[in-house]
């Protein structure tokens, strides 16, 4: 049985870091309709996350070429893992900036540990490492991010805009973009048809 708690219970002593935020049917901002956000940081000062189910027209190879890391003619030499890295539209903030969510088998000084198994790196070094096969075993890239000021996310959850549930690397990295939303709900025992009846946390 799914246990839910009131959004009023989300105080500054709690954190939604390493959680998925699922947009509820009551989401008022159309930019986030049916979106799934992986929360990278959440504290009294605000919150930051990456939308993981919005695709980008640019592919990973395109980004490497644009940054001068790779010549277009060399793209065939990219490791298969690099060619298959998904690029997402991470959110409306700083959309020209890249962020890489990845497994913890690649860590540099600039990496931020989001959980024991998931890190966030936002420097070009990780792109170079991935392009040469020295990067993490699992990764996705996003352009832009989603951000909230102090208390803003808590207010949106209280307004039934979001459902929060624990994240997993399997769903973060392995789910197809078109099925992530429903798969995360299913993993938490939630029927999408009954989503409007669920509030707060799963």
Curated annotation (Swiss-Prot):
One of its GO terms (cellular component) is cytosol. Coiled coil: none annotated. This is UPF0301 protein Meso_0753. Pfam families: DUF179 (PF02622). Belongs to the UPF0301 (AlgH) family. It comes from Chelativorans sp. (strain BNC1). SUPFAM superfamilies: VC0467-like (SSF143456). PANTHER family: UNCHARACTERIZED PROTEIN YQGE, UPF0301 PROTEIN YQGE. Gene3D superfamilies: VC0467-like (3.40.1740.10).
């Amino acid at each position: 049985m799914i246990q839910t708690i009131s959004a009023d219970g989300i105080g500054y002593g709690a954190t939604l870091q390493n959680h998925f935020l699922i947009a509820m049917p009551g989401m008022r901002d159309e930019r986030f309709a049916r979106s799934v956000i992986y929360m990278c940081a959440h504290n009294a000062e605000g919150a930051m996350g990456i939308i993981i189910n919005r695709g980008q027209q640019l592919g990973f190879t395109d980004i490497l070429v644009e940054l001068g890391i790779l010549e277009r003619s060399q793209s065939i030499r990219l490791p298969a893992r690099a060619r298959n890295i998904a690029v997402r539209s991470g959110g409306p903030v700083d959309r020209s900036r890249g962020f890489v969510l990845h497994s913890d088998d690649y860590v540099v000084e600039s990496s931020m540990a989001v959980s024991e198994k998931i890190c966030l790196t936002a420097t070009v070094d990780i792109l170079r490492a991935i392009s040469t096969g020295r990067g993490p075993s699992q990764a996705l890239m996003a352009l832009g991010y989603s951000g909230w000021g102090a208390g803003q996310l808590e207010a949106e959850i209280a307004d039934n805009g979001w459902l929060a549930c624990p994240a997993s690397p399997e769903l973060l990295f392995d789910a197809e973009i078109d099925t992530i939303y429903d798969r995360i709900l299913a993993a938490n025992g939630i029927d999408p048809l009954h989503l409007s009846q669920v509030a707060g946390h799963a």
